[in-house]
């Protein structure tokens, strides 16, 4: 298996679908073989892939349309489907072993299992799932067993919070904690005030409001780190930035520690086991400094603060699009070796 590239198909060519495609096409250990999206033409798909308001133009190889069913990335053909029902997508025909389910619609096990009928061997849901096992790379991916066919990569915020919470809990113990994420705009929000029956505040104009919102990200940490189950919860503020978000984790510690000791522990882990997942900075950074950062969580040593040696606020940045999309691919690579 060492030399054989892992063949990936993507269902849903939205923000995460397109960025997972970008990540895959820039790596040597994986290969993009198929994309399915019933709502866009092949021509429009190339345009959406080529131009990106946040991450810039695609510059890695020329993108051409071979025919209605095939895109060429340089010389590499990628099959395009436009099928609504996931059961009917012929993944096996295209050679896709792993399917990234990034429509945001088929997030539970039953719905995601439809991809297996078309010949996919494994499905990774790029969203939290109420019943599929959730994995956060750097935290609990070692618990993946090869008989699991449908898994979730959790949420971008859980991917930011969990590595940080793991380090703090392993080193100092967490009694309890509250998280706030100051989160960039996502596709579910509205450009101007509009109807949003499930979340009235969420229907307000995204580009000129700070919008309080719910998030399951902190509670989900308890699913990937059972030791923290019931110890964390949190909420979100949606703010008018297009990408990059920041987690503010306020925790009560079991073991007394100075802020410097906490910084040292996080720095050590960021250079050790969690290298490439958890970052550490002492620079005077702001959100745009992290656009295109492929780490899950970058601890901002200067932004955090301790009230006492057992009560501390920790701040960690994440590119909620690019970092997360990078982890989706990392998880697939990990699964292929299990």
Swiss-Prot record:
Regulation: induction: Not repressed by darkness or sucrose.
Knockout or disruption consequences: Delayed growth, small siliques with defects in fertility, and alterations of seed and fruit development. Reduced respiratory rates, pyruvate levels and Krebs cycle intermediates. Increased reactive oxygen species levels. The double mutant gapc1 gapc2 has an impaired ability to enhance heat tolerance of seedlings and to promote the expression of heat-inducible genes.
Residues the record lists as S-nitrosocysteine modifications: 156, 160
Location of S-glutathionyl cysteine modifications: 156
Active site: 156
GO MF term list: copper ion binding; DNA binding; glyceraldehyde-3-phosphate dehydrogenase (NAD+) (phosphorylating) activity; glyceraldehyde-3-phosphate dehydrogenase (NADP+) (non-phosphorylating) activity; NAD binding; NADP binding; salicylic acid binding
Post-translational events: S-glutathionylation at Cys-156 in the presence of oxidized glutathione (GSSG). S-nitrosylation in the presence of S-nitrosoglutathione (GSNO) or sodium nitroprusside (SNP). These reactions may be both a protective mechanism against irreversible oxidation and a mean to store inhibited enzyme in a recoverable form. Glutathionylation is reversed by both glutaredoxins and thioredoxins in vitro.
Impact after mutating residue 156 to S: Loss of activity. Loss of glutathionylation
Name of the protein described by the UniProt record: Glyceraldehyde-3-phosphate dehydrogenase GAPC1, cytosolic
Species whose genome carries this gene: Arabidopsis thaliana (Mouse-ear cress)
Gene name per UniProt: GAPC1
